Regions:
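Active-site loop-to-helix "anion-binding N-cap" substructures in soluble metabolic enzymes
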Residues: 1-256
Length: 256
C-alpha cells in the first residue's frame, strides 16, 4: 500500500480555544469551506464544544474528536471524561499524548499507553502524539526517542486495533513557536515511525498506518510537507482556528 492508498487525515486541534458560541460560528464557516475535501477532516475541540460540534457536523464530511480521554471507564476521578462518555456523544477521535499534556500535566509514555488502550476499547480512534525537544534533536537522539515513544504507546495494542490508530509526529520545538520542521526532517521521522510499526506489526500494517505531521503547519508550508511520501496528514493547531487557513491545508492534503 503506497501513499495514494492510505487515508490522509487533517485534524484541527483547537486546544483551549473557542466558547460554544464561538465554536458555532467557526464550524458554520468550516462546513462549506471543506465540503469538497479529498481527505478526512477532523476537528478536535474542547469538552465544552463537543455537543455543539457533533450536532452541527451531522450529515457533513467533518468528524469530531476530543483533546483528552481518561484511562478508566468510570469512577471517582473528578474532572475526567471516559471513552464511553465520548463515543456516546458521537465523538470519533481523541488526541493522546500531546506535548502540552506531557509538559504541563505530567503525561508520561505509560499513561499515553493506558489512554490509547482505553480509547480503542471504547470505540475511539486515538491520534497518538510523539516527538522530541530541541535539546533532544541537537543531541541526535530524535529517532531513538520517537521509536521508544511509539513502542510504549502501542504496547498491548493488537494488529486489528492498529487499523484505528493515527500517529502524529510533533516536534516539541515547533509547537506554537512558529518554527517548523523542514519537509525533509518531517519525512525522516515519519518514515522512522512507520519503520518501527513495521517491526512491531509487519510491513503491511505499517504501510496502512496514517502518520501525521504536527508543528506549526500552515497554508504556506502545508503543500511541501504533505508532498512527502510518509506524511499522510497534519495535526493543526493555530491554523485550525481560522476556516480559510484550515481549508487551504485540507486542499493541500487532497493534492498531496
Amino acid at each position: 500500500m503506497d501513499k495514494q492508498n492510505r487515508k490522509a487525515i487533517i485534524a484541527g486541534n483547537w486546544k483551549m480555544n473557542k466558547t460554544a458560541t464561538e465554536a458555532k460560528a467557526l464550524i458554520s464557516e468550516l462546513i462549506p469551506a471543506v465540503k469538497d475535501a479529498g481527505c478526512e477532516v477532523v476537528i478536535c475541540v474542547p469538552f465544552t464544544d463537543l455537543v455543539t460540534a457533533v450536532e452541527m457536523t451531522k450529515g457533513t464530511n467533518i468528524h469530531v474528536g476530543a483533546e483528552k480521554v481518561h484511562f478508566e471507564k468510570s469512577g471517582a476521578f473528578t474532572g475526567e471524561i471516559s471513552a464511553d462518555m465520548l463515543t456516546d456523544l458521537g465523538v470519533e477521535y481523541v488526541v493522546i499524548g500531546h506535548s502540552e499534556r506531557r509538559q504541563y500535566f505530567a503525561e508520561t509514555n505509560e499513561t499515553v499507553n493506558k489512554r490509547t488502550k482505553a480509547a480503542l476499547a471504547g470505540g475511539l480512534k486515538p491520534i497518538i502524539c510523539v516527538g522530541e525537544s530541541l535539546d533532544q534533536r541537537e543531541q541526535g537522539v530524535t529517532e531513538e526517542l520517537v521509536r521508544m515513544q511509539v513502542k510504549i504507546a502501542l504496547n498491548g495494542v493488537t494488529a486489528d486495533e492498529l487499523k484505528n490508530v493515527v500517529i502524529a509526529y510533533e516536534p516539541i520545538w515547533a509547537i506554537g513557536t512558529g518554527k517548523t520542521a523542514t519537509a525533509d526532517q518531517a519525512e525522516e521521522v515519519c518514515a522512522a515511525i512507520r519503520k518501527v510499526v513495521g517491526e512491531l506489526y509487519g510491513e503491511d500494517a505499517a504501510k496502512g498506518l496514517t502518520v501525521q505531521y504536527g508543528g506549526s503547519m500552515n497554508p504556506k508550508n502545508a503543500e511541501e510537507l504533505l508532498s512527502k511520501p510518509d506524511v499522510d496528514g497534519g495535526l493543526i493547531g493555530g491554523a485550525s482556528l481560522k476556516a480559510d487557513q484550515f481549508a487551504v491545508i485540507v486542499d493541500a492534503a487532497t493534492k498531496g
